[in-house]
Each structure stands twice: as C-alpha cells, then as structure tokens.
Swiss-Prot record:
Pfam families listed in its UniProt record: PPTA (PF01239)
Record lineage: Eukaryota, Metazoa, Chordata, Craniata, Vertebrata
The protein's name in its UniProt record: Protein prenyltransferase alpha subunit repeat-containing protein 1-A
PFTA repeat ranges, renumbered to this chain: 86-119, 121-154, 179-212, 218-251, 294-327, 395-432
An example Gene Ontology CC term for this record: cytoplasm
Amino acid sequence: MAEWKEEVEVLVQRVVKDITGAFRRNPNIDEIGLIPCPEAKYNRSPIVLVENKLGVESWCIKFLLPYVHNKLLLYRQKKLWLNRDELIDVTCTLLLLNPDFTTAWNVRKELIQSGTLNPVKDLQLGKLALTKFPKSPETWIHRRWALQRLVQELVVAAVVDKDAICPETSERIQAIVEEEMHVCCEAAGRYPSNYNSWSHRIWVVQHLGNLKATLLIDELSSTKHWVSMHVSDHSGFHYRQFLLKSLLSKTLKDFDNVGAITDLIANEENLCLPRDGEANWNQICFDLPYLLEEEMDLNRELVDSFPGHETLWCHRRQIFNLIHQLLLEQSQSATPQSTSASIPDGSGNISQMSTTFQSYVTNPMDIDGMSDPNKQGYTQEIKRLKRAPVQDSLSFDSELRFINCVLTNCCSPEQSRFAASYRKWLLSLQGH
C-alpha cells in the first residue's frame, strides 16, 4: 500500500512537471481539454500538446486532482512548505482542472500582491480555464480583480513617469478592453446564456471603458450578428439593453445640459464617435432614436424569422420602453426656445415633438449621398434604412399593427401567446 502511494505521488509529480513544461515550450496555448482515456495504455505522459492545444488524458485526473488539492490545503494550513515556483505550478494545475477552487485563486492573489507573479499571467491562465469551464464564476471574479490590479499598475507607472495618462497607457488599456471582449465572446459561444460572461462584459464597459459612447456604439454593432445567431440567449440581449440604456442616460443628461436632444445626424458613417478620445460630452453627437429604431427593426426581423422565442419578445418590450422613456423625458425637458411642449395624447401617441426631434422625423435620411457628391454607393445594410418616418415606426399604433399582423399570420401557438402577452403589456403602458 505504501509503495502504491509512492508510485502515485511520483506519477502526479511528473504530470505537474509535464504541464509546466508544456507552457514553457509553448506560451501560446489557447485551449485545454480532456482526452477520453479510461486507463493508461502506453508508458507515456498523459499530457498531449498539439500546436496550441493542450490535452490531458482522463485516466490521470483521479490521481492528479486530489494530489494538488491536498497539497495546497496543507500549505494553507502551514503543514507543508512550498516555494514560489512550486506554488505557481500547483495552483496552475489545480485551476486548470477545477477553476472554482477559491483557495487557489487567493494564493495567486497573494503572489501578485507580493510582486512574485504578474497579473497578466493570471489573465492568461483564466482565459485558458474558460475554454474548458466557460461559466466558472470564481474565474470571472478573479479576472476582474486581476484587471483592476493591472490597470492600477499601468496608471501608477504613468504617474511616476510624470506622463499622467500617456497615450501609450491609454492604448494599452484599450487593448485590454478589446481582449476582454474577445474572451467574453468566446465564453458566451461555448455555453448558452452564459450570464457570468455577459456580466463580466458589462463590468468591463463600465469600469475599463468608462461607458464611453464610442465603445457603447461599437459594442452594439459588434454583438448584432451574435444575437442574431443566438435568438434564445437572454443574457446576450440583456447586454444590448444595457448598452442602449447607457446611451439613453447620456442623452437624458444632455437634456439637462443643453435643454434639447443632442444634435441628431442622418449620416450612418458618423454614428460611431471619433477614435481620438472624448474630451467633452457636449462635443459628441450620436443618433439615439436611430439606434433604437434599428434595434426594433432587427427584433422584428428575428421575430419573423424565428417564431416562438420568448427572448425576442422580452427584448422588444424593453426597447420600446426605452423609446417611450426617451420621448417622455424629451418632452418634459423641452424649452420654448428649441421645442414646443410635448405630451402623450389619449391614444398613447406623441402629439407634439421638439422641433429638433421633429426635424429628424420628417427629413429623409441622406443614405444615397445625394447631398454629398463625394459619396459613392452604399451597402445593402444602408439600403435597408429606407423606411417609414420614425414617428410612425415607433408609435403605439404601429406596434399594435405589428402584433395584429403576427397574430393573423403565425401558425405557432407559442408565438401567438407571446404576441398576446406583449399586446397586453403595451396596452397597460399606453393607459399609464
């Protein structure tokens, strides 16, 4: 029995070394997985490295995981001494097999705080663990801590160099944000309705992206295709609701500052903000009504193409509520100089609009470049923007017509039930 335990210990020590060696040979490993193998058939290492993929034969897990787990617990109980390299190797192996073991992440936090470990290493480790365990809450929690630590180090280094937030630091933070968006997208694709992944993405936009309008609009654009391919993913659509709500908050703040809606633009090319920063919000303009209408159009296409998905109807409810809130706030914030009073009439439609908003409603969009001879052509996506006036397409009546059309033409009982529920909610909002 004692000899068998010694053999197992020798085996797992070799496996830990093989995992460490694999990372040294190829620092660009981007995925980990288990290789189904009930028992060891050959006298070789169970660690397989093929290009940038790391595989672990399943037969060794029952020996490896308890070994590294107990070893780390003995260290925390001060019954076993492990040097820096041993701690890094043991926690790395353990977290690749069980990333929700909080103690291992806490040990690595201490190593980072002592300057022994670079937070970038933990971001790489977490990214790798998420390829196998994309919903791991402890991995996402530690990732946010490591990101805060990394950004703090970058800012402190810039201040020490008396460069304030130099362009290099800003570019580095922007690169971190882009990498996090990629990690979140990969994790969301590996696990349906990955709430932890989308919540992390929201956190990145809030704390690293500072809710910049540029980032918000870019994220709306970049996630459009994703949600179109995952029409039942509540978390993905909730993320788009967060983006639009954030843009709405910026618009409402602008009402307080200038007494009218931000200058609206009809040219699609100008919807994304300048890449060189945002010194002053009042100098920024974006077309929120246009973005909301685009979201409603996208939702309508998905509802027609994929009947019977409750997620789409819940999302439509949220977006129409944002439109309703925007128009109410805009009417309440209107001033005589720039607008005429605007309140919902008895039918639930907007009886009057600000002159600024009304001009957007009535003026055709310059999608053909008629006013600019330098513009040449336009894509099919821009062609699709030739539509009815915004006032009509965003009204209660238009929504009721849409619902009636769905109820008349659909053959899905689920679709009929969701449409009827949406109509009931719409009428309650109209009566409010």
